[in-house]
Amino acid sequence: MEDLIVKIFKESSQLKESFVNDNLSIIVRVVNVMTAVLKAGNKVMIFGNGGSAADAQHLAAEFVNRFMIERPPLPAISLSTDTSIITSIGNDYDFSEIFSKQIRALGQPGDIAWGISTSGRSRNVFKGLEQAKKMGLITLALTGKDGGDIAGIADYTLNVASDSTPRIQEVHITVGHVLCQMIDLKLFQRPDIK
């Protein structure tokens, strides 16, 4: 059992290392875009299913409350949390519309729509990003495996090239934390950092 535990930790750390080596330049671009969006007074809408819904809720809380420093709240919302909205759309229309309808209601040009899908194939996440693009929002996808259809629709895609859902999720939350920390740094401590 001990060997298996060590193996899991090593797989997680190795995947994070290969991910950052492959995606560092796009992470920097995403930090700069998100910083500009928030500085302009626009918002971030985050969404996903299952564990990705939990990540969306978690990361929205980091923006709205605080991450590591005391600072003013930043406008972010998880579209995965309102059970009345989600179930009414799912019941009256289709589950694939649960994010796209919310984006139609809440999104404004210049906002960010951030979809999370470990498979890259979640139909409702795809349709949410598709709707966001139609409305002039900036789209960000956090995906796994080969990125799926979602990778092809987003303005910015951070794909974790793995078939292991738990390891993908571990990288996803690390990416979210890195974005929060770098945005805090750029907005409130080191605006000169590139």
Model-based region annotation:
Residues 1-22:
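Generic N-terminal amphipathic, Lys/Arg-enriched alpha-helix
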Residues 15, 41-43, 109-112:
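Short, surface-exposed connector motifs at secondary-structure boundaries
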Residues 52, 57-193:
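Glycine-rich phosphate-binding loops that contact phosphosugars or nucleotide phosphates
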Residues 22-40:
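A short, well-structured juxtamembrane/interface segment
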Residues 44-45, 139:
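Hydrophobic beta-strand scaffold residues
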Residues 1, 23-26, 52, 133:
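Residue-level recognition of alpha-helical structural elements
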